[in-house]
UniProtKB/Swiss-Prot annotation:
Gene symbol of the encoding locus: CYP2C31
Localization, UniProt: Endoplasmic reticulum membrane; Microsome membrane
EC number: 1.14.14.1
Protein name per its UniProtKB record: Cytochrome P450 2C31
Reaction(s) the record says it catalyses: an organic molecule + reduced [NADPH--hemoprotein reductase] + O2 = an alcohol + oxidized [NADPH--hemoprotein reductase] + H2O + H(+)
Induction of synthesis: P450 can be induced to high levels in liver and other tissues by various foreign compounds, including drugs, pesticides, and carcinogens.
Transmembrane segments: none
GO molecular function: heme binding; iron ion binding; oxidoreductase activity, acting on paired donors, with incorporation or reduction of molecular oxygen, reduced flavin or flavoprotein as one donor, and incorporation of one atom of oxygen
Binding site for heme: 229
Pfam families reported for this sequence: p450
EC top class named in words: oxidoreductase
Domain of life: Eukaryota
Record GO cellular component, one term: endoplasmic reticulum membrane
Length: 284
């Protein structure tokens, strides 16, 4: 919904949109089901809660709720718990799946890149075991490909909105306290000074002359600073293990000539959505 024109109408007339037909009604239904599921899980945690031995985030939140139950201004409420769990659940699944989908599309478009990744997988991991995170440091090309996928697709072009907590002087500008700030990650990820030919998918953007992985402060796929994505470590791990596992066991085959594969996003709003594409997974 947030990456379609419907979001503009929803923001202006949230109560009316539910009466119009469209795929957004499926989204609303799914959100209701997700909220119901989360509430059921919270109730299970309430029944099994051990104040001296909390097991997870929900347990810790419930304990904090109990401690602040007499504080009328507490942010530790049931509604905030449900919303936070839903945010973590949705943000931790949709972004990773979209990145992986877009990554497979780019590898389909560039078979020469796929071949180099598979050669590195054969050399470092082999075929007789599953990949692990310790392999990543010995796979600079694969690491560069993963970074280039995230840089190129520019999954969250405008980042999430922030608010200035105090008056800030930035260069010649005064930003008053309370000002909403929307930053452009695109301007960094597609900076031509840091990434030559930023509009081209090229893993060399993250490789030095010796073929070693090259870090750069301009890689901000997860934002930066104190408000950096809290799931960055998990997302990096998931993307590496999933992509390597797929290419370890399968060769990607397009149903059309790679030259005719469209890699432009089907829609670019809050998220960059990859276009629909059919592909074949041929066991290695």
């Amino acid at each position: 919904l947030v990456s379609t024109p419907w979001i503009e109408l929803f923001n202006a007339f949230p109560s009316l949109l539910r009466h119009f037909p469209g795929s957004h009604n499926t989204i609303f239904k799914n959100m209701t089901e997700q909220r119901k599921f989360i509430l059921e899980e919270i109730k299970k945690h309430q029944e099994s809660l051990d104040l001296n031995n909390p097991q997870d985030f929900i347990d810790y939140f419930l304990i904090k709720m109990e401690k602040e139950k007499h504080n009328k201004h507490s942010e530790f409420t049931m509604d905030n718990l449900i919303t936070t769990v839903w945010d973590v659940f949705s943000a931790g699944t949709e972004t990773t799946s979209l990145t992986l989908r877009y990554g497979l599309l780019l590898l389909l478009k560039h078979p020469e890149v796929t071949a180099k990744v598979q050669e590195e997988i054969d050399r470092v991991v082999g075929r007789n075991r599953s990949p692990c995170m310790q392999d990543r440091s010995r796979m600079p090309y694969t690491d560069a490909v993963l970074h280039e996928i995230q840089r190129y697709i520019d999954l969250v072009p405008s980042n999430l909105p922030h608010v200035a907590t105090q008056d800030v002087k930035f260069r010649e500008y005064l930003i008053p306290k309370g000002t909403a700030i929307l930053t452009s990650l695109t301007s960094v990820l597609h900076d031509g000074k840091e990434f030559p030919n930023p509009g081209q998918f090229d893993p060399a953007h993250f490789l030095d002359e010796s073929g070693n992985f090259k870090k750069t402060d301009h890689f901000m796929a997860f934002s930066a600073g104190k408000r950096v994505c809290v799931g960055e470590g998990l997302a990096r791990m998931e993307l590496f293990l999933l992509l390597v596992s797929i290419l370890q066991h399968f060769t990607l085959k397009p149903v059309v000539d790679p030259k005719h594969i469209d890699i432009a996003p089907s829609f670019k709003g809050m998220l960059s959505i990859p276009p629909f594409c059919e592909m074949c997974f041929i066991p290695v």
